[in-house]
Amino acid sequence: SKLSEKEQHMESNLLCFKRTPTLTALSLPKTYKEGFFTESGVWTKLIIIKGKMKFAFLNLENELIRQYSLNPKSNVELIKPLSVCRITPNSTDLQFQLEFYCSREDFFYNKYNLNTPHSEFIDAIKVVNPCKTLDLGAGKGRHSLYLSLLGFDVTSIDYNAEFLHELTDISIKEKLDINVIDHDIAKANIKGSYDFIFSTDVFMYLNPTRIQSIISNIKQQTHLNGYNLIVSALNATKHGRPLIPLPFTFIEGELKEYYEDWKIISYSENITASPYPYAMILAQKVSE
């Protein structure tokens, strides 16, 4: 089947997160011979090193849809997510490997078990081009690492040394250059200035008396035409949502008011979100 342009573009952006050791006709796990599922969001590449195999696509009842005879010279397309496949050795000297690929968004989840980036964050960075960026309360770095992968110049700050250690570790393994700083956000004294400052799921863990100073500080340290993105918990008790046992929740409209002197690119209050309602803002500094 010919790949559409969209599929070709998608596949050219995939990243390999795992590779099997070399499998042989003798060491081939039983599941491969009986029929195995490829996971959601995971493309599989078959690399035949030596020998021959029969590769079959099956339906959900394990009945044959189509089958190919393959050898090291065969041109094998990527196996799409949620396919049912079966591998049958066709020579005793068969040797092959499988490589597993996913989108950039899912890469650090699949390889390091980090949470995937927040959906609001993914939408926001469609607006923001790679630039000098501050991740305020980076945690283990699910957003910092993703942005660094996309070519952003990232500084990550957090007050949890263990998380920062993990973030540094992954960035070294992936050869990503991230500036990692142990810093207490509540001090509201960020020194450097940035084109993009963002904070997702962080404000709700901070002391409520510090929120105004922190937002004022990050607005000040944002370059002209730069952006701020904040996503944090929202009090939606009047909509029947339970009170959230967190140190701080924005009330309706509050987050938007903090940015009334900026250009608001998008603002929303997601009342039905799980596990808790949240407010999000993406705003641009249009005047000093």
Predicted regions and their residues:
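Short acidic-glycine-tyrosine-enriched beta hairpin
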Residues: 61-81
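Class I (Rossmann-like) S-adenosyl-L-methionine-dependent methyltransferase catalytic domain
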Residues: 102-128, 139-178, 182-192, 206, ...
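A conserved beta-strand element that flanks and buttresses the S-adenosyl-L-methionine
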Residues: 198
